[in-house]
Design a protein with these regions (language model features):
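Hydrophobic alpha-helical segments that drive targeting, anchoring, or assembly
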Residues: 7-27, 31-38, 43-44, 48, ...
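Membrane-spanning helices that line or support transport/gating and their immediate boundary helices
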Residues: 109, 113-117, 312, 316, ...
Length: 517
């Protein structure tokens, strides 16, 4: 089961990146499970098991945050390792369990990567469609909020295309659509309603299975420069990503994000203390499954304490309602083994469908599924299961949030200051690149967009911390406005037109005369 849960990761990534990411998830799952099984086979002292569970949860939280792996984050890894800690084991059984985990992980890898044989550019299509919709919202309702959302969506689409591997005709068309979405948010003579409807129409066609629609060319040859400059820029950036020096720099950045002074460390410390406190409280009260409290506490921690408080309420409500659902379906699940399997499959599907849309509704489905899994070994008294689950949920939520409140994250303000400096530097580079070759200009614009996205994320994280020194909110606002003005000015600067890169065999699109070789 542990290996199969790896299939929950990487759904928004292009298949080339997804294959590598899922391989890493399988290895991380196996490593965490191995540490838990070895610990469980060597000792039965609850205090040691809880300490190891809390330490594993903190390491998994820090690793997932540093790599930005996305949902479901560390929660699934913590669920598996914590449950394994409290399962009776013998040391000789561990290799077989790990081999089964790797085998199931390989199946999960095939399931998640296999659709590439049918729809190779599916993730890229969805990312580009989201960028087009965000651009349409920006055109229809100009304002700081929609501008930030459009910038973030366009940046995410570019990153998805950069990670997709070698260019194909479809990806070339998708790149043109993203460049078109980026250019569409600048002022134009087109009626906003008509332009927004056109962008939404392009988004709907992009999500489909048919050919990717190419935006209509501008009326003049010279106006081609804005959009097609981006194609040369992404070619140059894709080539830079293959540079071994760039990869080494990325690894060093990852290590720095886990080193002293990192804003991720306070959240990892919260996870360590909260999970340990929750486990020890449940053990002291004689609850039979302290790992439930550990998982509950681990699932609460978000980027700041405000989001953690919201997640605490959602998790508690969802788990308590989920216990009621479990009590209702338990008699049905015990009629036949097939009924138990079907119930687990149903709640697993419901959890996958709901949890990204509404967390507490997803928790309503996850809770009965987790309780029903225990029935595969042997039936348990319903009252005991329900009582333990309710107590673990309440204690885990209380202990987890208490740790979040006690461990402050004053480094969040420092992250904002660093983001302000990076944004100012990126804006200066973008302004200087206005007279440079198109590839450099496009790359500088994307770097500025990335810095603006990082600045907004850092500011939102810092403002959600309850105990924090005064934040430079006016400086953040001024930096965002200046960055948006620079993006608009550079997007409006057309370049000379000449031979374009090929998008499909025998055809070309107009593009600037200087490209990335």
């Amino acid at each position: 089961m542990a290996g199969s849960l790896c299939a929950l990761y990487g759904h928004g990534l292009p298949y080339a990146r997804r294959a590598r990411t899922l391989a890493g998830v399988v290895l991380a799952m196996t490593a965490g499970l191995g540490a838990a099984l070895v610990t469980a086979s060597l000792t039965h002292f609850t205090a040691v098991l809880v300490a190891v569970g809390a330490l594993l949860a903190a390491v998994q939280k820090a690793g997932c945050d540093a790599t930005r792996i996305g949902p479901p984050g560390h929660v699934i890894l913590t669920f598996v390792s914590s449950a394994a800690l409290f399962a009776p084991q013998r040391l000789g059984q561990v290799p077989a369990h790990l081999a089964l985990t790797l085998a199931a992980g390989a199946v999960a890898w095939l399931v998640c990567v296999g659709p590439a044989l049918i729809r190779r550019e599916g993730p890229e299509r969805r990312a580009v469609a989201r960028a087009l919709v965000a651009a349409a919202d920006r055109v229809a309702d100009p304002g700081p909020r929609t501008h930030r959302a459009a910038a973030a969506a366009v940046h995410a689409a570019w990153q998805c295309l950069l990670a997709s591997g070698r260019p194909t005709p479809v990806r070339r068309s998708l790149e043109r659509l993203v460049a078109h979405a980026e250019a569409a948010v600048t002022p134009s003579d087109t009626a906003p309603e008509a332009e927004a409807d056109r962008l939404r129409g392009l988004a709907a066609q992009t999500r489909g299975r048919g050919p990717v629609s190419v935006p209509p060319p501008p009326g003049s040859q010279g106006a081609y420069g804005t959009e097609y400059t981006e194609l040369y820029g992404i070619d140059a950036e894709r080539a830079a990503l293959r540079d071994p020096g760039r990869r080494r720099a990325a690894r060093r950045a990852l290590l720095r994000s886990l080193g002293p002074g990192s804003p991720l460390l306070p959240v990892a410390v919260r996870t360590l203390i909260g999970c340990g406190l929750a486990g020890y409280l449940c053990a002291a009260l004689g609850v039979g499954r302290p790992y439930w409290a550990i998982v509950t506490a681990a699932s609460l921690y978000q980027a700041n304490i405000t989001l953690t408080w919201n997640r605490t309420l959602q998790r508690t409500l969802g788990n308590l309602l989920g216990v009621l659902v479990f009590a209702a379906v338990l008699p049905l699940s015990r009629t036949t083994p097939l009924a138990l399997v079907l119930c687990c499959l149903f709640f697993g599907f419901a959890a996958e469908a709901l949890i990204t849309r509404n967390y507490w509704l997803g928790s309503v489905a996850v809770t009965p599924m987790a309780l029903l899994v225990l029935e595969f070994g042997a039936p348990h008294p319903a009252g005991e299961l329900i009582g333990d689950r309710v107590l673990d949920t309440v204690l885990g939520a209380l202990a987890g949030f208490l740790a979040a409140a006690l461990v402050t994250n004053r480094r969040a303000a420092g992250r904002v200051e660093r983001a302000l400096e990076a944004t100012a530097k990126a804006r200066t580079e973008a302004e200087r690149a206005a007279g440079r070759p198109p590839a450099e200009r496009a790359r500088a614009r994307r770097a500025l967009t990335a810095s603006l996205v990082e600045l907004r994320e850092a500011a939102d994280t810092a403002v959600g911390e309850w105990w924090q020194r005064a934040l430079p909110e006016q400086e953040v606002l001024a930096a965002e406005q200046a960055g948006h003005r620079t993006l608009t000015a550079t997007a409006q600067r057309p370049g000379p037109a000449a031979r374009a890169p090929e998008t499909r065999r025998g055809t070309t699109v107009p593009a600037p005369s200087i490209g990335a070789e």
